[in-house]
Amino acid sequence: MARGIQGVMMRGFGARDHQATVVSTEAITPNLLRLRMVSPTLFEDAVAEPTSWLRFWFPDPAGSKTEFQRAYTMSEMSPETGEFAIDVVLHEPAGPASRWARSAKPGDAIAVMTLGSAGFSVPEDPPAGYLLIGDAAATPAINGIIGVVPHDIPIEVYLEEHDENDRLIPIAEHPRMRVHWVVREDATSLAGAIEARDWSNWYCWVTPEAGSLKHLRTRLRDEFGFPKAELHPQAYWTEGRAMGTKRGDDDKTPEVNPAPRADKPEAPAPAAAGRGNWRAQAAGRLLAPLKTTLIISGVLQAIITLVQLAPFVLLVELARLLLSGASSDRLWTLGVVAISLLGTGSFLAAALTLWLHLVDARFARDLRTGLLTKMSRLPLGWFTARGSGSIKQLVQDDTLSLHYLITHAIPDAVAAVIAPVAVLVYLFVVDWRLALVMFVPVLIYLVLMTVMTIQSGPKIAQSQRWAERMSAEAGAYLEGQPVVRVFGGAAASSFRRRLDEYIGFLVAWQKPFTGKKSMMDLVTRPGTFLWLIVAVGTPMITSGAMDPVDILPFLLLGTTFGVRLLGIAYGLGGIRGGMLAARRIQTTLDETELVIREQTGKRDGEPAVVFDNVTFGYRPDIPVLHDISLQLTPGTVTALVGPSGSGKSTLAALLARFHDVDAGAIRLGGRDIRTLTADELYRQVGFVLQDTQLVGGTVAENIALADPDASIERIQDAARDAQIHDRIMRLPNGYDTPLGAASSLSGGEKQRLTIARAILADTPVLILDEATAFADPESEYLVQQALNRLTRDRTVLVIAHRLHTITHADQIVVLEGGRIVETGTHERLLDAAGRYRQLWETGQRPALATAAGPTGEAVR
């Protein structure tokens, strides 16, 4: 069958035919047909991810040997069985795809390719929301995206209605999704229907008819400010060209009054807002002060590159003069000029590098200062949501990546472009025929690179996800070595299995490219260019078609042509890495800071702590705490209990102002905590977390974090009260022993060290995340003694994980689903036979099971 130049090119890029056989057909709507197919080899190349699409070769309805290529997104896929489905819009008049689909029956076969398809995946740093725009043809891809978007991220779907049956197409479910149907009156209808609001940091998937796409791109870019990185446009079809045939006037889309879907009521519209900052443009904002400097450095590098090439040109002219018998004075003059230019080029290159290093040093100083200042104003919740590794990467590694971008990447990239272009121009002037030969290795390299890039397709994104996943798992595996070694191979074998899967993925991806990579390396070597120059230049010289001296510039400059071209990739790679680092840094600088509000008045006579109708959510419009009202009387212990995910830790974190509430207020001694500075707040509120943290420094410095000026006597008294003094004295240097990540203290000892820190801080209000949860029995007793001393005469809010530790609390608050469901003492709540009693009885069952004897009966 004839596929024309398009088919030849696709085969050249490594695409291969797979035969797909129709299994069944199903009419989703009167004008949308689902074809279920099976192919035993398709998923050797295809990726089973949302939005993955296939290239079908449909026969010509006229009966010729020509085949027509059409692309369809898979609406169903099963790599294990090789089964998949596509949804075909049945156009009238029918083109090749529509006509074939209408007549398709089980057993019919068709050729399929997978070249160029890329799947969709939710990024690790999710966008503010997803704006999905299309029509009936785009619904398989849109449904695929909806199916993997987390339920706490909003989705806005705009679908263009070309036929009254379009609204019958099933749309995937999502709790935060709104679907808008827009009747097509002309190509501007869909663009005009997009809500005027702040779309900052939304991901936009645009796949409508080609005419609509043109107007959509204009409005999304110009009015809403969508950057290219967040705008993913592609025309799925063109009106008037019904799958390759001319559409007549009779099949004009009928107008239908828009109506909301019966099975999918729309949620309230979000409030309009002004245009905000886009994360995709963050790098540009960070580097804006350096824009002029970087442009100047690029221009200077271009000049320096030409100056550095000039001596080689003069060397060729020197050889030409020498062979022609020129006078020694002329030769000396030319030689001195060449040496002078060589020295000048080296001096200018060194001066440019020195200048850029000075610029980078000042920029890095200001950047680190601004970054650390910003971090001091961020809520503590920002830090708890990130590991120390990511913060280290931000402050240290990313700023180092900017060093290469500022000082080296631009000059390297400019030199890599200017040098080969200048060399090529000069060689064409010398002899255009031999210069033309220099393109042969370059073209081979570019073709091979293009083929590899196209064949890699979705595997590039997969490799990035694999690398991120393996980096995280390797870190967790190394950190958990003590546990892994004690408890054996389960964790180790799991990590090794995942590592083997990763290696298998890389081998399967790269093995077919072995020959291509070897060829790419070969064609860019200086020896390859030298062989070409000699092989072509020698016959030209012997035949008199070329002056012998003219081959010298090719031997001096042409042999390095391939190496110079490779410098472009290295320079662009450095720019790409630096821009990603700049984006991460600027995104951090754009984070919302804690704002100190003006004090509007103090409510005298209030309890120590008051939660007044507090509502809070980690993402907008998704509250995890609902209208929490709670009072903590001075000198009492209040325990928060509830199942996992009920909001205990979140509620306690709000008192420490890890985050600001969305609604309501938290008052401390009658003052809204948002009117307190960090120093004022943490002089009154202390906390002991279950996940203890030690900082680099001595034992004494760790205890004295809250009061760096504390005397050694006060530090030791706090340690005695925390039952840790004797253990400290057994350390090599006592209180002067350095501690840190490699500390030899046990978990219980670290907990007692943090309790000593809280005792020394002596705050009237204490937040306690049940610190004995992971302590051994002996250490638990010492920790409990330390806690008894710590909680004396304080207002305590304790997050209880084991109910038997809080039976004597003055007040027990039961949370479920972010709401308070019960409040009272242990005895009253047990008598009430409510949720607390259920939790209590559930907590007793493991204890009986643990105490079971050999026969399985409980030991009394």
UniProtKB/Swiss-Prot annotation:
EC number: 7.2.2.-
Highest taxon of the lineage: Bacteria
Membrane topology classification: Multi-pass membrane protein
Binding, FAD: R70, A71, Y72, T73, D87, V88, V89, L90, H91, A97, S98, T238, E239, G240
Cofactor(s) annotated in UniProt: FAD
Periplasmic membrane side: 315-335, 431-433, 547-550
Residues that span the membrane, as ranges: 294-314, 336-356, 410-430, 434-454, 526-546, 551-571
Spans within the Cytoplasmic topological domain: 1-293, 357-409, 455-525, 572-860
Main location: membrane
Keywords, in A-Z order: ATP-binding, Cell inner membrane, Cell membrane, FAD, Flavoprotein, Membrane, Nucleotide-binding, Translocase, Transmembrane, Transmembrane helix, Transport
ABC transporter domain location: 609-842
A GO molecular-function descriptor: ATP binding
Annotated binding of ATP, by residue: G642, P643, S644, G645, S646, G647, K648, S649
Functional summary from the UniProt entry: Part of the ABC transporter complex IrtAB involved in the import of iron-bound mycobactin (Fe-MBT) and carboxymycobactin (Fe-cMBT). Has a preference for Fe-MBT over Fe-cMBT. Mycobactins are then reduced by the siderophore interaction domain to facilitate iron release in the bacterial cell. Transmembrane domains (TMD) form a pore in the membrane and the ATP-binding domain (NBD) is responsible for energy generation.
Subunit text: Forms a heterodimer with IrtB.
Protein name: Mycobactin import ATP-binding/permease protein IrtA
